[in-house]
Design a protein with these regions (language model features):
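Basic Lys/Arg-rich amphipathic helical interaction modules
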Residues: 1-25, 32, 45-74
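Short Lys/Arg-enriched helix C-cap and helix-to-coil transition segments
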Residues: 35-41
Length: 74
């Protein structure tokens, strides 16, 4: 089985244990890049891994604490 290079918000939520609404909030705060395909939003697996490592001891529900991925400019 090949590893996915991108996941939907729902797949990322299942994979990480982070709630779908929390992931959507993080995306709306422009903390990580996403890919839009029609109405579907994809998150690259590599970006998700980097984001989680960067925010290891962070409350992801608190925008003031969340560290956006370096180099990600909206």
């Amino acid at each position: 089985m090949t590893e996915k290079i991108a996941m939907t918000v729902e797949e990322a939520a299942d994979f990480t244990g982070i709630g779908r609404n929390t992931l959507r909030q993080l995306i709306s705060w422009k903390t990580m890049p996403t890919i839009k395909v029609g109405r579907k939003v994809l998150i690259k697996t590599q970006d998700l891994d980097r984001f989680l490592e960067l925010n290891r001891n962070t409350d992801l529900r608190n925008q003031a604490e969340v560290i956006p991925l370096k180099g990600y400019v909206n």
